[in-house]
Amino acid sequence: MKLRLGLVGVGGAWENRHRPALRALSDRFEVRAICEPVARRAEIAARDFSCDTVDGFRALAAREDVDAVIVLSGQWFGALPILAACDAGKAVYCAAALDFDPDQAREIRDRIEKSGVAFMAEFPRRQAPATLRLKELIATRLGAPRLMFCHQRVPAEARKGPATGDAVSRTHDLVELVDWCRYVAGYEPTSVLGLTHVKEGEPKEIDYEMMSLDFSGETPGTKITAQISSGRYMPACWPEAVSFRPPAALQVACEDGVAFIDLPSTLIWFDHAGRHMESLETERPVGEQMLSHFYRSVTSLVRSTGGLEDAYRAMRIVQQAHRSHAEGCRIKLDFS
């Protein structure tokens, strides 16, 4: 059985992730229509997959020959393509940046739940070969995590005006990092402490964000602590500085060892026996793994919305981290 797809946008990961994955999984997916505001990109993608171009995402979601909607780029649409797919009863795969206020995030979650459609948010760090192998090692060799350090360094583009798209991208990056730590920890955090640094000058832009997640119960600091940071303080015109001694994407100190991940497929870990290095280049690309998972969730008789709750909780944590910075205190987390 092939799933007939409607694509909303092509997004920044189109050439390297989504297009190759859809090509490789042509036995499971068939692209029937594309909605992309930039006409030239729409024409190229439509020609590539021999499909139609559609003027609006609502018309795309309403098509009878579309079984699922793949949102690859939010652009100015925001959550509207997701809601349109829910109204049309179509499954949703969301790779667009997730940046909604608390009320809107709650509304989107409720609308998806009421619609009864399958939903999956794209979190590629979860499905990276190195992450999956780390979960195996935690269960078999390294023991339970105690401390996690998750860092991201992104080149900052020079801008003269408001950078709304950058703000959405920055928030989405944090949402994905938070979800990654939740997944590796295997628990929900109970509190968050956030800190934001704003670059001087006009326009004012955030160039560094940090948060500390505590996974303990009543007594803080007694279980798992995760430190997450995302920096955009190095100009893109300094490529050598950006790539100089980059920190490990994720460092996990466990009961019986420590592990370092460099995405997508390099894992170095240490235990009492010494150093172990694993290169997992032979694993299936992340894009194929995620779309295969989406295919199974849509064709299964059991409805899957696990990604929905994961996305909602990660968004809530980032929002509460921003609140923590504004109020200057640690915030207890409530996901109701």
Where are these regions (language model features)?
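N-terminal Rossmann-like dinucleotide-binding module
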Residues: M1-D48
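C-terminal helix-rich "cap/oligomerization" subdomain common to oxidoreductases
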Residues: L7, A68-V71, S216, R296-S336
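A contiguous active-site-proximal alpha/beta segment in oxidoreductase catalytic domains
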Residues: D99-G161
